[in-house]
């Protein structure tokens, strides 16, 4: 990839990773418009790592409090709201880990297509709208509970299908289960940390063993740009949903799905 392509794709990834609009749907548009080839798994991991750094730094105080409380719960048997939240995040991670191992090759081979992404972009956009309009939305992140956490975890596993949007699927599930918009977003952001970290480690291992050359300069640039874009995105997204809800993102998903369908069928 040339530098321009790296910048554009990293910006897209960083700006869309934590919005409920599907980063994979946006990453396929440059390929359709400009004839770019698939950026490959190594670049996906690089820009996802940049996004991971962004959420860790943005929520550093919450994550540190959760980590200390989690350790205390195991060493001293002391349980607090933060330790419970940490355990719920771990529990919510398990479905994605399991299905990621089981279905990784199938997804890469059969579901990474424009048609699948177009359909899931629209369908899960409508589900997000329904959840935002019809649900209670009055629970805080500390009222999630292990049952709700596990169900949100299964939604995250479903988001392994390209176009679904990890943040979109998890926020939809959280809203359906009664979490407030802010709580749904924060739980979704926090549960992205272990999944993204695990995926980066696993794929990084595969890349290290691969005989193919790796463009480390492009990967580093992509990571930095994705980090900056994702950090700003998290900050402003939390402000937007408190004022306007999810409707702007639902409308955007429907338009994006229609555009993708246009590229496919016209």
From Swiss-Prot:
UniProtKB keywords: Antibiotic resistance, Cell inner membrane, Cell membrane, Cell shape, Cell wall biogenesis/degradation, Hydrolase, Membrane, Peptidoglycan synthesis, Transmembrane, Transmembrane helix
Superkingdom classification of source: Bacteria
Membrane topology term: Multi-pass membrane protein
Reactions catalysed, as given in the entry: di-trans,octa-cis-undecaprenyl diphosphate + H2O = di-trans,octa-cis-undecaprenyl phosphate + phosphate + H(+)
Cited InterPro entries: UppP (IPR003824)
Chief place of localization: membrane
GO biological process: cell wall organization; peptidoglycan biosynthetic process; regulation of cell shape; response to antibiotic
EC code(s) of this entry: 3.6.1.27
GO molecular function: undecaprenyl-diphosphatase activity
Matches recorded under Pfam families: BacA (PF02673)
A GO CC annotation given for this chain: plasma membrane
Sequence intervals crossing the membrane: 1-21, 39-59, 87-107, 111-131, 149-169, 183-203, 218-238, 246-266
Localization in the cell: Cell inner membrane
Entry-linked HAMAP family: Undec_diphosphatase
NCBIfam families: PRK00281.2-4, undec_PP_bacA
Chain's role: Catalyzes the dephosphorylation of undecaprenyl diphosphate (UPP). Confers resistance to bacitracin.
Family: Belongs to the UppP family.
Note, other: Bacitracin is thought to be involved in the inhibition of peptidoglycan synthesis by sequestering undecaprenyl diphosphate, thereby reducing the pool of lipid carrier available.
Protein's name according to its UniProt entry: Undecaprenyl-diphosphatase
Native source organism of the sequence: Shewanella sp. (strain ANA-3)
């Amino acid at each position: 990839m040339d530098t321009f392509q790296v910048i554009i794709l990293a910006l897209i990834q960083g700006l869309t990773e934590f919005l409920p609009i599907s980063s994979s749907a946006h990453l396929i548009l440059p390929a359709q418009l400009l004839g770019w080839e698939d950026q490959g798994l190594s670049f996906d991991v690089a820009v996802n790592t940049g996004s991971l750094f962004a959420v860790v730094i943005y929520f550093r105080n919450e994550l540190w409090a959760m980590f200390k409380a989690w350790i205390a719960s195991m060493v001293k048997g002391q349980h607090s709201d933060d330790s419970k939240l940490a355990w719920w995040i771990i529990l919510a991670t398990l479905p994605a880990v399991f299905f990621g191992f089981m279905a990784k090759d199938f997804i890469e081979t059969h579901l990474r297509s424009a048609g699948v992404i177009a359909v899931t972009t629209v369908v899960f956009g409508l589900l997000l709208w329904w959840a935002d309009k019809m649900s209670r939305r009055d629970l805080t992140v500390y009222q999630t509970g292990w049952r709700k956490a596990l169900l949100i975890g299964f939604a995250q596993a479903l988001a392994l299908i390209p176009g679904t949007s990890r943040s979109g699927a998890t926020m939809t599930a959280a809203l359906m289960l009664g979490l407030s918009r802010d709580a749904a977003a924060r739980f979704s952001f926090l549960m992205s940390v272990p999944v993204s970290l695990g995926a980066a480690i696993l794929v990084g291992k595969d890349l290290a063993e691969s005989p193919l050359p790796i463009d480390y300069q492009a990967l580093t640039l992509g990571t930095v740009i994705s980090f900056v874009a994702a950090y700003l995105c998290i900050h402003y997204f939390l402000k937007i949903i408190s004022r306007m809800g999810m409707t702007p993102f639902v409308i955007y998903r429907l338009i994006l799905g229609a555009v993708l369908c246009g590229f496919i069928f016209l």
